[in-house]
């Protein structure tokens, strides 16, 4: 870290600005907005700067070191490099922080790009290395941060003591503020400057006093790429106090979990349940009973070939509140990253998702229906069962030459796509690792031309496409 970000209180503090032109004008606006007691030294002044300095000090002179006396900060904002260098040297000798505009090497501090939602302030800097990138980031942040953010912060400051007195424990207070800060109704009241109504909203919410109970939120983490996590999913994992996660949740998604949340790996993976389901249920319930906000984080979509419904049924039986945040399932995410459309006007009018890992005493699927030629068949957790799947599909009429694709670790930098035909599927599966998705149908051949993520896809077991 080349610079330590700091916020300086300049109200009524002495600040010296050397320069009187356009460059100095821009800095003067910032310093005056911060309440500085400004002294400007320059042979002449920009007309607008003259107006700004009413109530402040202007010295019509060239800079000398004597003007540094009693100053907290110094800004050199001239277009004369020699003068700027002289100011920097004198300030360094006097042990006063100095900024030379557009010259970080001579500066002991620099001005960041500022997004002002006072009292909320956001500062962005590249240390002078990438000013265009900083400008782009500032524009994005300006669009992202609502204009009422400052009013929201001021309102929270006004209510802080009342909330602390009413809600005795820190968990209840945090939940109150999270609800307030996420409320569309409160946001609308502040955006439209209905301050009395905003105050009443706060009073009503505080009176409700429902912030102590636990809850369970079932969140789909998506297929691997952290960019595919939904916005609501991100919000939930950043508000969680306890997170129970599967092996299929990528490290990149786990890195987005709130830092002080308790993380518990329950290790679920096809055929390998390191924590039995009844123990997972009890972990969820016990933490929720203790008043915690618990997130059950599952790979893909939580209701797609997982046991999310069973977990929520356990919560319902205990009377524990719950909610669900859907995620992008592997059938949608992995196929898209492999360049395989699930449906196509010419060859696939439907798509069917099945699991290759069923209960041992479960009924056989309808293989005749699954072998239909005008549909895409997507199989989750099908590596181990691929020989039996291949045999049954061919026996029920699916062509042995039907294109197939096996997508390993879809949407991640370690994605591999193995291409072949249905009759080659068992051999392809021998070279694949979990998690993998099997796609059977004419659309699988389109990966040859529609592949976009990391490289081209080739056919045949001998061509393992590593997209890392």
Curated annotation (Swiss-Prot):
S-adenosyl-L-methionine binds at residues 223, 299-301, 329-330, 381, 410. Its EC number is 2.1.1.107, 1.3.1.76, 4.99.1.4. The modification Phosphoserine is found at residue 126. Pathway: Cofactor biosynthesis; adenosylcobalamin biosynthesis; precorrin-2 from uroporphyrinogen III: step 1/1; Cofactor biosynthesis; adenosylcobalamin biosynthesis; sirohydrochlorin from precorrin-2: step 1/1; Porphyrin-containing compound metabolism; siroheme biosynthesis; precorrin-2 from uroporphyrinogen III: step 1/1; Porphyrin-containing compound metabolism; siroheme biosynthesis; siroheme from sirohydrochlorin: step 1/1. Residues 214-468 are annotated as: Uroporphyrinogen-III C-methyltransferase. CDD domains: SUMT. The active site is at 246 (proton acceptor), 268 (proton donor). GO terms for biological process: cobalamin biosynthetic process; methylation; siroheme biosynthetic process. Disulfide bonds: none annotated. InterPro entries: 4pyrrol_Mease, 4pyrrol_Methylase_sf, 4pyrrole_Mease_sub1, 4pyrrole_Mease_sub2, CobA/CysG_C, NAD(P)-bd_dom_sf, Siro_Cobalamin_biosynth, Sirohaem_synt_dimer_dom_sf. NAD(+) binds at residues 22-23, 43-44. Pfam families: CysG_dimeriser (PF10414), NAD_binding_7 (PF13241), Sirohm_synth_M (PF14824), TP_methylase (PF00590). GO terms for molecular function: NAD binding; precorrin-2 dehydrogenase activity; sirohydrochlorin ferrochelatase activity; uroporphyrin-III C-methyltransferase activity. Signal peptide: none annotated. Keywords: Cobalamin biosynthesis, Lyase, Methyltransferase, Multifunctional enzyme, NAD, Oxidoreductase, Phosphoprotein, Porphyrin biosynthesis, S-adenosyl-L-methionine, Transferase. It catalyses: uroporphyrinogen III + 2 S-adenosyl-L-methionine = precorrin-2 + 2 S-adenosyl-L-homocysteine + H(+); precorrin-2 + NAD(+) = sirohydrochlorin + NADH + 2 H(+); siroheme + 2 H(+) = sirohydrochlorin + Fe(2+). Residues 1-202 are annotated as: Precorrin-2 dehydrogenase /sirohydrochlorin ferrochelatase. Then it catalyzes the NAD-dependent ring dehydrogenation of precorrin-2 to yield sirohydrochlorin. Finally, it catalyzes the ferrochelation of sirohydrochlorin to yield siroheme. In the N-terminal section; belongs to the precorrin-2 dehydrogenase / sirohydrochlorin ferrochelatase family. This is Siroheme synthase. It comes from Tolumonas auensis (strain DSM 9187 / NBRC 110442 / TA 4).
